[in-house]
């Protein structure tokens, strides 16, 4: 029996299966704000042990993705702010840190990232409470600072402000290094002193990987280095310097995966192929939109921007980022033909106004003019004038008003380069 089969056999155990089902039910109840957490101490302990086992496997290649999901939901069973749960967690999953909640939130947010639950990771980290100067040794302070800086990079609750907090966290460690490092190392014998010094240098390289990622997230297209290579170089050095502390090596390896996820999810990644797209992304970043949602990234990977396609269909839930993808398509269409006109069709008058204001806010920043049709059942003279103006780039309309314009052979819809149909399945109704 290989290792994978052995893990699956454990998961098929009746008691484990009941716990996993209960965790899944509790997780979904919590997602609709129903707190039905009634786990016994023995169930919390089993949750910790099983989560610890699955976490160790979840960040390796070719691992069953369900294991990360199981581990994430098991951790959600644990109320780390409650003394009993925290003590159980510390006994099983703790490390050389006084503030064990750092490890809890590190695992929780890292699992969320690997599962592409970026919003869940950010929401989870809003629950994290920072305790100042709680760590007793210098190496603990450095590791705690690295965790906190990582949390800021993932959370982004204040956009660039959280990213700057991450940089500040590492900067404070650099200032404290002069005060605490020698004092910390001098307490050891020569051999141990050498080992501890190498561990510290490894942690410093890990912190450098964090600050480089933060600089990339802030500077975007102006960051001149290959950020993925920079991060990998610092992490590789850190792992080489820490050969024997298996747990610390695991932390650093997971941090590497977290940083690579943040880079891939960034609004700067994969959007530098066209100048106007870059300008749009820079505008959005100034309004604290710093990463693409999973649905947006997936759509971009599936050749949504194929300019030779006659039609593209995107099926996404509400608030999944369709408008931003539409804006990218508008910009690409205009880049191919400066006088191109785009008609954006939405199913209701209320949505006409909403989409109009959203598009105008974003696209006017890069010089595009957005107009909307009126709610009138006929075409009034004022409307007719602005719809055929040469500087109109995008028209937002309901299907009914568009149908009227087409039936009247109105000049505004004679030469349209791109139709964007929102809620296309409702048009027949």
Each model region followed by its residue ranges:
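N-terminal helicase ATP-binding lobe
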Residues: 1-429
């Amino acid at each position: 029996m290989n290792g994978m089969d052995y893990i699956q056999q454990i998961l098929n155990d009746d008691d484990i299966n009941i716990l996993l089902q209960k965790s899944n039910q509790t997780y979904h109840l919590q997602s609709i704000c129903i707190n039905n957490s009634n786990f016994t101490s023995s169930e919390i302990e089993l949750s910790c042990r099983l989560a610890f086992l699955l976490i160790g496997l979840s960040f390796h290649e070719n691992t069953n993705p369900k294991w990360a999901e199981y581990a994430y939901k098991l951790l959600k069973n644990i109320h780390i702010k409650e003394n009993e749960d925290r003590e159980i967690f510390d006994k099983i999953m703790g490390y050389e840190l006084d503030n064990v909640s750092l490890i809890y939130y590190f695992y929780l947010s890292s699992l969320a990232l690997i599962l592409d639950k970026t919003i869940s990771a950010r929401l989870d980290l809003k629950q994290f409470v920072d305790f100042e100067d709680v760590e007793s040794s210098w190496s603990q302070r450095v590791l705690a600072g690295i965790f906190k800086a990582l949390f800021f990079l993932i959370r982004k609750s204040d956009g660039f402000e959280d990213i700057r907090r991450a940089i500040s966290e590492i900067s404070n460690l650099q200032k404290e290094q002069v005060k605490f490092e020698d004092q910390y190392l001098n307490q050891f014998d020569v051999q141990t002193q050498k080992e501890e010094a190498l561990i510290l240098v490894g942690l410093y390289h890990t912190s450098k990987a964090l600050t480089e990622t933060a600089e990339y997230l802030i500077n975007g297209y102006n960051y001149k280095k290959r950020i993925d290579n920079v991060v990998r170089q610092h992490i590789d050095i850190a792992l080489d310097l820490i050969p024997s502390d298996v747990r610390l090596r695991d932390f650093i390896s997971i941090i590497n995966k977290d940083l690579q996820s943040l880079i891939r999810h960034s609004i700067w990644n994969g959007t530098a192929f066209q100048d106007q797209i870059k300008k749009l992304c820079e505008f959005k970043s100034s309004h604290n939109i710093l990463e693409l949602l999973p649905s947006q990234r997936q759509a971009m990977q599936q050749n949504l921007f194929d300019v030779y396609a006659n039609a593209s269909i995107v099926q996404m839930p509400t608030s999944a980022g369709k408008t931003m993808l539409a804006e990218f398509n508008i910009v690409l269409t205009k880049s191919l033909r400066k006088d191109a006109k785009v008609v954006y069709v939405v199913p209701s008058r209320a949505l006409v106004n909403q989409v109009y204001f959203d598009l105008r806010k974003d696209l006017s920043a890069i010089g595009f003019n957005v107009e909307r049709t009126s709610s009138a059942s006929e075409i009034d003279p004022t409307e007719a004038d602005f719809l055929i103006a040469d500087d109109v780039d995008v028209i937002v309309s309901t299907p009914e008003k568009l149908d009227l314009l087409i039936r009247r052979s109105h000049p505004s819809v004679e030469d349209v380069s791109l139709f964007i149909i929102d809620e296309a399945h409702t048009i027949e109704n």
